[in-house]
């Protein structure tokens, strides 16, 4: 059963009418409701606010990293553990083939259902998760394998244990190491890109976002609480933070925006996976043909351009 967001109620009503028409075999009504649905959905999705895009990025049916891995990666083999503490289920590392191209895929996984969400810690990695990602990345570098990273986290886990085991050090270490990694890298925000938790696997030759994903230094709820001491101002905070793919492309913080299927990736997971796969293959082949020294220089130049002040 489809999950509808608050701004999709008219769409829900039309789809319910459409299903009823299909159940009774009313061909004329089906045609009318299909046209109505197309018209209403086009109008709704053409005028989405930043907050509505945030809702889509967090949609409970939105495909997660593991969904994409299962749809695009052949002969997948999972890598476990950081060799220092434990295996963190919030970070996935898989070796496999994407259309014949050997690839390491690193992804942040939120989980579905209560048990799985708890297992994945709601997609909030511990330091051992980031260390696992770095261990796998270093192995890929050693064997000359390109890396695809899928970002989807509300943020790094801020618990006492995580801080005691060096959460900030693990994130900082990844920023350093991934900036110098001598192998082609592509990072894609597939849902939420939350602060340092996202940056830890976000330093790459190419950084892209799915159309309805978000990337931010803080959650809009956290921003509203700090600036106005009022959680009700979350919509105002969302707009002020400039967290959408369009905003970040305009600011020069991301390289590309990957289009999503009509009404979002959750409506067509296979279509979303196809678009992501095509983007990866097109760009990774270009990166692999570049001189390694030139590729690293371009990555460095891109990072150095970030954080410019503009009035």
Swiss-Prot record:
One of its GO terms (cellular component) is acetyl-CoA carboxylase complex. Residues 34-286 form the CoA carboxyltransferase C-terminal domain. Transmembrane segments: none annotated. It catalyses: N(6)-carboxybiotinyl-L-lysyl-[protein] + acetyl-CoA = N(6)-biotinyl-L-lysyl-[protein] + malonyl-CoA. Keywords: ATP-binding, Cytoplasm, Fatty acid biosynthesis, Fatty acid metabolism, Lipid biosynthesis, Lipid metabolism, Nucleotide-binding, Transferase. Its EC number is 2.1.3.15. It is found in: Cytoplasm. GO terms for molecular function: acetyl-CoA carboxylase activity; ATP binding; carboxyl- or carbamoyltransferase activity. InterPro entries: Acetyl_CoA_COase_a_su, ClpP/crotonase-like_dom_sf, COA_CT_C. Gene3D superfamilies: 2-enoyl-CoA Hydratase, Chain A, domain 1. Acetyl-CoA carboxylase is a heterohexamer composed of biotin carboxyl carrier protein (AccB), biotin carboxylase (AccC) and two subunits each of ACCase subunit alpha (AccA) and ACCase subunit beta (AccD). Belongs to the AccA family. Component of the acetyl coenzyme A carboxylase (ACC) complex. First, biotin carboxylase catalyzes the carboxylation of biotin on its carrier protein (BCCP) and then the CO(2) group is transferred by the carboxyltransferase to acetyl-CoA to form malonyl-CoA. This is Acetyl-coenzyme A carboxylase carboxyl transferase subunit alpha. It comes from Nitratiruptor sp. (strain SB155-2).
């Amino acid at each position: 059963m489809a999950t509808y967001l608050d701004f999709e109620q008219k769409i829900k009503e039309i789809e319910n009418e459409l299903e009823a028409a299909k159940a009774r075999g009313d061909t004329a009504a089906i045609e009318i409701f299909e046209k109505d649905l197309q018209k209403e959905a086009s109008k709704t999705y053409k005028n989405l606010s930043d907050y509505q895009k945030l809702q889509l990025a967090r949609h409970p049916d939105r495909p997660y990293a593991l969904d994409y891995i299962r749809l695009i990666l052949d002969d997948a083999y999972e890598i476990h553990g950081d060799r220092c503490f434990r295996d963190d289920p919030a970070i996935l590392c898989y070796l496999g083939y994407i259309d014949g191209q050997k690839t390491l895929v690193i992804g942040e996984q939120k989980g579905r259902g209560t048990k799985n969400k708890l297992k994945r810690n709601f997609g909030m990695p511990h330091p051992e998760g980031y260390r696992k990602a770095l261990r796998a990345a270093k192995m890929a570098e050693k064997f000359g394998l390109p890396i695809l990273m899928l970002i989807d986290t509300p943020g790094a886990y801020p618990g006492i244990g995580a801080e005691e085991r060096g959460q900030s050090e693990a994130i900082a270490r990844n920023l350093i190491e991934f900036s110098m990694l001598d192998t082609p890298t592509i990072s894609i925000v597939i849902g939420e890109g939350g602060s340092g938790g996202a940056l830890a696997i976000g330093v790459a030759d190419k950084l892209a976002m799915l159309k309805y994903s978000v990337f931010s230094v803080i959650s809009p709820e956290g921003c509203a609480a700090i600036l106005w001491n009022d959680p009700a101002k979350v919509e105002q905070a969302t707009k002020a933070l400039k967290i959408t793919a369009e905003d970040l492309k305009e600011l020069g913080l991301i390289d590309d925006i990957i289009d999503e299927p009509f009404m979002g990736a959750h409506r067509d997971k296979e279509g979303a996976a196809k678009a992501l796969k095509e983007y990866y293959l097109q760009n990774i082949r270009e990166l692999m043909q570049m001189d390694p020294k030139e590729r690293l220089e371009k990555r460095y130049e891109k990072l150095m351009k970030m954080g410019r002040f503009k009035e």
